[in-house]
A protein has these predicted regions:
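Extracellular jelly-roll beta-sandwich "head" domains, especially the C-terminal globular C1q domain
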Residues: 1-134
Length: 134
């Protein structure tokens, strides 16, 4: 099981995003666990997974970027980055984590502030099963 998805649309410029992150391009989806239109990953097998998010905070904004990772409808942790100066470039934001999922568990990403993406610098969400459990 492995997936990689990219969000290249809808965040051009200085965009405040509040809501579930969806992904317009799914490059690989072996195991059919990821749905780009909803942004939800549903574990096809129980096991240990390596998950990753990367993106960029919006430029020229003195604020922060915060991505919440939800498991089965409950927030389990936050990915946060502060942009403390009006910079022409946003900050790169990335995080990789390892977690145990049971078959059917659902993960999604939620944003409550500024993000930036376009075709050359997409937001990405990916995951892979690294150990199967019975």
């Amino acid at each position: 099981m492995i997936f990689n998805a990219r969000k290249t649309e809808g965040l051009e410029g200085f965009t405040k995003v509040t809501g579930d992150l969806t992904f317009d391009q799914v490059d690989i989806n072996i195991g059919d666990g990821f749905d780009g239109s909803s942004g939800i990953f549903k574990a096809p097998l129980s096991g240990i997974y390596r998950m990753s998010f990367s993106g960029q905070s919006a430029a020229y904004i003195i604020d922060y970027t915060q991505i919440m990772v939800y498991k089965n409808g409950y927030p389990i942790f936050f990915i946060t980055d502060g942009n403390e100066a009006e910079k022409a470039d946003g900050n790169n934001v990335s995080y990789t984590w390892i977690m145990r999922l049971v078959k059917g568990d659902e993960l999604k990403l939620y944003s409550d502030n500024y993000l930036y993406a376009y075709s050359n610098e997409p937001l990405t969400f990916s995951g892979e099963l690294i150990h199967i459990e019975n």
